[in-house]
Amino acid sequence: MLSQLRKRKNRRGQPVRESTVQHYLSAVSAVLSDAKRNEIIQTNPARMIDLPTTNRMEQHIPTVQEVQRLLQALSMEPRHFRVFYLLAMATGCRRGELCALQWQDIDWEQRSIHICRSAVKITGDEIFVKEPKTRSGDRYVYFSAQMENLLREYRRACLYITTIYDERELDTNDFLFRRQGTRLPMTPTTFTWRFKCILKKNGLPQELNVHSLRHTAASLMIAGGADVATVAGILGHSQPSTTLNIYIHAFDKNKKPPARACRKCWRYDIV
């Protein structure tokens, strides 16, 4: 299977990257893990495959000006897209983790969200919701009073839409970001596509993507003085060394004065 994937071409006619092959393998492994959990198969053969390590590209972390322009652009977006992207920036959660969020995962008193599952798109409209791969992936993230107001406002809108259009009550196990008229979560690729449209429409760097919001959250934590272990725990990394390897440049860059300006813009504009 992997050899066939490596022979494929992307939309630009170029060979697919090794990281893409790994993403495909992860999706297949998730399905097989579920089959093993349900005693359909005894072992997950996908976990026995050793893949070569890939060179990690330095991520484009938005500048202060880019963050401000992005916030302005998000203010014009439909509510569910706006909440999704702001939540990604505020918590550092992955696309799949946000897509798999249910209302029962929110603790309003503690202002916390239990990250305990992830949504993976398989093919077409099929989507698979799975548990975190590691213990560190099952975690709690916290949000501000401003984010609480935004989430409560969003929940009221979801209550109204579910009552009027679905003719039922909003359940605690409903997904926060749900396909209208169904109980299925929206797919991560939907938010990827929309984000690209936002970037293009507002003249923002095309190097940015939804995962850049996770990097932004991490950079702001680092700029705010959080240590590596704390950031690793919030992001769901198994080892603090993973966090350090990814954000070593961010640690250096965000020690500079612009980081303070970025935190200020976060405090007033980004919930």
Predicted feature descriptions by range:
Residues 53, 57, 119-121, 235-261:
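Catalytic-site neighborhood detector that most strongly recognizes the C-terminal catalytic loop/helix
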Residues 14-18, 22-24, 37, 41-43, ...:
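Basic, Lys/Arg- and aromatic-enriched nucleic-acid-binding interface segment
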Residues 61, 65, 144-205:
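Active-site/catalytic core of tyrosine-dependent DNA strand-transfer enzymes
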Residues 110, 123-138, 145-147, 153, ...:
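C-terminal secondary-structure termini that scaffold catalytic or DNA-interacting sites
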Residues 105-112, 205, 226-248:
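Short, polar N-cap/turn motifs at the start of nucleic acid-interacting alpha helices
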Residues 1-38, 45, 56, 79, ...:
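N-terminal core-binding DNA-recognition domain of tyrosine site-specific recombinases/integrases
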Residues 36-44, 107-117, 121, 151-168, ...:
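Proline-centered turn/helix-capping motifs that create local helix->coil transitions or kinks
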Residues 37, 86, 90-97, 190, ...:
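C-terminal catalytic core of tyrosine-transesterase DNA break-rejoin enzymes
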